[in-house]
Regions:
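A short, aliphatic-rich alpha-helical micro-motif
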Residues: 11, 121, 179-182
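Alpha-helix C-terminal capping segments
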Residues: 47-56, 270-273
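A structural signal for isolated positions on well-ordered beta-strands in alpha/beta enzyme cores
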Residues: 17, 58-60, 152, 187, ...
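Conserved N-terminal subdomain of the carbohydrate kinase-like
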Residues: 13, 24-37, 52-130, 135, ...
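Conserved phosphate-binding/catalytic region of the ribokinase-like
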Residues: 2-13, 174, 204-317
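Short beta-strand scaffold segments in enzyme catalytic cores
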Residues: 48, 91-94, 227-231
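Positively charged, low-complexity intrinsically disordered leader regions
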Residues: 1-30
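Conserved beta-alpha-beta core of the PfkB/ribokinase-like small-molecule kinase fold
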Residues: 126, 130-209, 226-227, 233
Length: 317
């Protein structure tokens, strides 16, 4: 497909720009099952989630010619800022019995800088920054925030569960990165697992409070089966219970791959409508509960529609 002609002049306005690397990924489960190679990464999951909910998503990433059979999963995104490279970032995603994960990187694409964002995308109001392993420079977030953009940053790729070397705030480099991002974003998001590496030795609520002390306006934290909460200065954390998820797979198991990224996508799909954080939290939880009912990696057909989410939110179905 010719991506330079796919979008007419009237279609070139995007609702949100998502920035970070995409992955050529093999997912390994504790029971020995493997799927892949599939497209993975926070960018891919959250972008497809938002697209399924009717959001026009622009993506800024590098990609190689090494996965022609699966790159088509991104066909419903505005891909004109996908930059060709000699290879796609390639990895093995390994899940442990307790649900935590680690990643073995095989190949990596280059870092993403502000100058890599095309002019049309720079005009967008909303940006979601969600790297895997520090590949999006923190000063990119600072530049966007100072331009008055609404900037959502997923900290998982800045020392959290997807990072190769996990620099915590106890390291000079880790502190500089996290404090820069907190000061130059509208919302920061992390999982409880991410925060165990980024802000070690603290509970999730304590870690969120620490992020606020570094300058974050709002800190959103996902906590698996316990739900999710957000913290803001001068307020107690506001918790949201998870929605009940029932597997649609023959083996009866939920697939947690992409759960946190799907929450982030569902959150932003709602947030860009009216800036209502409570509605966004509920939409994020509802979205994630539906995604984990299906397996198969990061595919558009796995992602719930706005109508399906509304039905679960209303009835629990």
């Amino acid at each position: 497909m010719n991506w330079r002609t796919r979008f007419s002049a009237a279609e070139k306005k995007v609702d949100i720009v998502v920035i970070g690397t995409i992955l050529k990924e093999i997912v390994h489960f504790p029971d020995g099952r493997e799927i892949g190679p599939v497209i993975g990464s926070p960018v891919a999951y959250s972008s497809l989630v938002m697209a399924a909910q009717g959001v026009n998503v622009g993506i800024v990433t590098y990609y190689g010619g090494d996965m022609p059979e699966i790159i088509g999963e991104l066909d419903m995104l505005d891909r004109r800022n996908m930059m060709p490279w000699e290879h796609t970032t390639t990895n093995m995603l390994m899940y442990r019995e307790d649900g935590t994960k680690y990643i073995n990187y095989i190949k990596k694409a280059p870092p993403i800088r502000y100058r890599d964002i095309c002019r049309a995308f720079r005009a967008c109001r909303y940006f979601k920054i969600c790297p895997m392993d520090y590949e999006v420079e923190p000063k990119l977030a600072r530049r966007l925030y100072r331009e008055g953009k609404t900037v959502f940053v997923d900290l998982g790729g800045y020392g959290g569960a997807t990072s190769d070397v996990r620099y915590s705030v106890e390291d000079a480099y880790g502190y500089k990165v996290v404090s820069t991002l907190c000061k130059n974003s509208t919302i920061v998001k992390a999982s409880q697992e991410d925060l165990a590496s980024i802000v070690p030795g603290r509970t999730a609520e304590e870690a969120a409070r620490y992020l606020l002390e570094l300058g974050a306006r709002t800190a959103v934290v996902t906590c698996g089966g316990s739900g999710a909460f957000y913290s803001q200065a001068g307020r107690e954390p506001v918790w949201f219970r998870p929605f009940k998820a029932v597997s649609e797979e023959a083996n009866g198991k939920l697939d947690m791959t992409g759960a946190g990224d799907s929450f982030g996508g569902g959150f932003m799909a709602s947030y860009i409508q009216n800036g209502d954080i409570n509605a966004a939290m509920a939409n994020g939880n509802c979205t994630a509960s539906l995604v984990i009912q299906r397996s198969g990696g990061c595919t558009f057909k796995r992602m719930p529609t706005r109508e399906r989410i509304a039905r679960r939110a209303a009835t629990g179905e």
